[in-house]
Amino acid sequence: MEGTGKVKKYEVALFLKTGKAVNYTRIKKATDLKIEFNADVHEYDYIADVSPTSELEKYKPQITGLPLTMYREEPDFAMLWDLAYGLKVGGEAVGEMLLVYKFDEDAETTGQWKAWSAPATIIIKTLDAVEGKLEFDVQPRGTITQGTVTESGGNPTFQPAA
């Protein structure tokens, strides 16, 4: 990793694509973005050891409780409102997630950022009319593909790692 200093909030970018959309929509008007890694740790009590051993088996990252400020003119709200209003479930609630990490200083020279891509279930949780927020979760489905992203005109293009 190149560079120094604290990572800024705008350097972790969440993009979603739902339905028959061709391009990703960046989630811009959320006021929080926390990625929960959800480590799956198992304890094994091997007969040759005095104390049990903890083994990290896997991660199941997800984003929960993402509060989006509802601006009528914003594409991110329009996309999520379509899911909420339509009460979409099953396959209609599945989209594509692209999580782009724009804080590697090396990207300035390569024009590529590290990223994760995965199908994801988008779960609408709460519409708070008083606060003007729509809260939702993004839960990746299956394997998360690591790779890089280039951006042209605000549209990201994902390339899986070799």
Task: Tell where the protein language model's regions lie, with residue ranges.
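Solvent-exposed edge beta-strands and adjacent loop segments
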Residues: 1-72, 119-132
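Short beta-strand and beta-hairpin "edge-sheet" elements
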Residues: 35, 100-146
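Extracellular/virion structural assembly segments
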Residues: 50-116, 146-151
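Short, low-complexity, polar/charged sequence segments that are solvent-exposed and flexible
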Residues: 84-90, 118-122, 156-160
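Intrinsically disordered, low-complexity terminal/linker regions enriched in Pro/Ser/Gly
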Residues: 148-162
